[in-house]
Amino acid sequence: MTIKDESESCGSRAVVASPSQENPRHYRMKLDVYSEVLQRLQESNYEEATLPDFEDQLWLHFNRLPARYALDVKVERAEDVLTHQRLLKLAADPATRPVFEVRSVQVSPRISADSDPAVEEDAQSSHQPSGPGVLAPPTFGSSPNFEAITQGSKIVEDVDSVVNATLSTRPMHEITFSTIDKPKLLSQLTSLLGELGLNIQEAHAFSTVDGFSLDVFVVDGWSQEETDGLRDALSKEILKLKDQPGSKQKSISFFEHDKSSNELIPACIEIPTDGTDEWEIDVTQLKIEKKVASGSYGDLHRGTYCSQEVAIKFLKPDRVNNEMLREFSQEVFIMRKVRHKNVVQFLGACTRSPTLCIVTEFMARGSIYDFLHKQKCAFKLQTLLKVALDVAKGMSYLHQNNIIHRDLKTANLLMDEHGLVKVADFGVARVQIESGVMTAETGTYRWMAPEVIEHKPYNHKADVFSYAIVLWELLTGDIPYAFLTPLQAAVGVVQKGLRPKIPKKTHPKVKGLLERCWHQDPEQRPLFEEIIEMLQQIMKEVNVVV
């Protein structure tokens, strides 16, 4: 059982550290940017800059947002900071949010990593506004890491020069949203843009310390350079979502205050049952010991139940809302019927408020994510193949029982004291419907299949894509797309065929397996039964005893 890392959810965005936690170097850089922006606005005689408390309000604005905001913003576009201030102020009014701003922009061609710095400077300066009618650049610069990572993708390499050559000639627009910050808000916004046929080329997402969002997208796909038509289309799309019942009504709720905190939480959570199972635990037999992990919505403790060592995931009473209860119910509903050596064993749950918890077997060696990224350990090929096989067997079992995990990643893979790896965390898993396809996004952008990112119908093959990213992690010990934000990674996966770069010394058949599993077309990805066979064949070739 794992506690999710909220900073890597599908609504992932930067979170502000407290002043005592802030990196001193970042603080100094933020102060420098603030000072330069202030000077430019005052020298340009902006009306806002003449107000008595403007300096304090501007500093407050920078402090509301993460250091990355100051590091990324172009000081030459100091007036854009005023726009962000205005949008955040308007977003405080429930009657007006979500608020947004649209403008046409000029995007410079990307320069390759090995370009001459003088050439790069000349190229960039030649695309800066130089006269009437010339468009300004976007507020934030393109990530220099994005181009470097895409060089590892064959899909991108073949078309990169074409893309770069045409970026500066197509109409581009910058759309900035501000509203209440909510889980999965980014998914809702990207879906909204997709409904209008807009392609996201750059994305920057920030959260304020007081619970608001500032999301900036550079898009193409709108045929006109003017902004009035696009602004009207966005307004109509938002109104359309507000007016529609059912699932889309739920989508637009992400723009509003969370009313669930004011709703009554039932005394007992109803879990569907066929009458043949009994999983409600006797809390008096539960002994709670050391806390081993903590998240925004729950804590994970080590403990014992009827003398058996267990892991106990508690929901935090002060954070419980109806969406959390739905996921809690779903996790219990799925786990109570799951029995496989490569799936974490569910032992029971307490569904009576205020003690809401799920009890599973305790996995002594923790998550694969911690093993790779916190303990800085690595797998040799033989062990890697065994781990990959364990995961494939667990996932094959789930798929045979029509369960799509939807959040497969190394943080949700746990290892016991014998080195056996098991699939865990079914909070967002779903039982596949009869049609074989599902919609609505969940999961984590860095591991998410392109069809899920695009809000297209998807099936169990989405898990196969995530499995490929997991396999790449096992090979490299790195975090996927580490130098991109989760949202930038998502844009790259969908629009540029971005994939992590496979190490040169990778076993050829492991490389082939990776490429099949993360194929853009879900139909071309293998089933887990096939993956098991391929892994077993590779293990024979390298003399691994299964």
Swiss-Prot record:
Belongs to the protein kinase superfamily. Ser/Thr protein kinase family. It comes from Arabidopsis thaliana (Mouse-ear cress). GO terms for biological process: chloroplast organization. Residues 174-249 form the ACT domain. Residues 286-539 form the Protein kinase domain. It catalyses: L-seryl-[protein] + ATP = O-phospho-L-seryl-[protein] + ADP + H(+); L-threonyl-[protein] + ATP = O-phospho-L-threonyl-[protein] + ADP + H(+). The keyword Manganese does not apply. The lineage of its organism: Eukaryota, Viridiplantae, Streptophyta, Embryophyta, Tracheophyta. Autophosphorylated on serine and threonine residues. Autophosphorylated at Thr-439. GO terms for cellular component: cytosol. Disruption phenotype: No visible phenotype under normal growth conditions, but the double mutant plants sty8 and sty46 show retarded growth. Activated by autophosphorylation at Thr-439. Keywords: ATP-binding, Cytoplasm, Kinase, Nucleotide-binding, Phosphoprotein, Serine/threonine-protein kinase, Transferase. It is an enzyme of class 2 (transferase). Serine/threonine protein kinase that specifically phosphorylates chloroplast precursor proteins in the cytosol within the cleavable presequences (transit peptides). May be part of a cytosolic regulatory network involved in chloroplast protein import. Does not phosphorylate mitochondrion precursor proteins. Specific for ATP and does not utilize other NTPs. Plays a role in chloroplast biogenesis and differentiation in cotyledons, possibly through phosphorylation of chloroplast preproteins. The modification Phosphoserine is found at residue 435. One of its GO terms (molecular function) is ATP binding. The modification Phosphothreonine is found at residue 439. Its EC number is 2.7.11.1. ATP binds at residues 292-300, 313. This is Serine/threonine-protein kinase STY8. InterPro entries: ACT-like_dom_sf, ACT_dom, Kinase-like_dom_sf, Prot_kinase_dom, Ser-Thr/Tyr_kinase_cat_dom, Ser/Thr_kinase_AS, Ser/Thr_Kinases-Pseudokinases. The active site is at residue 407.
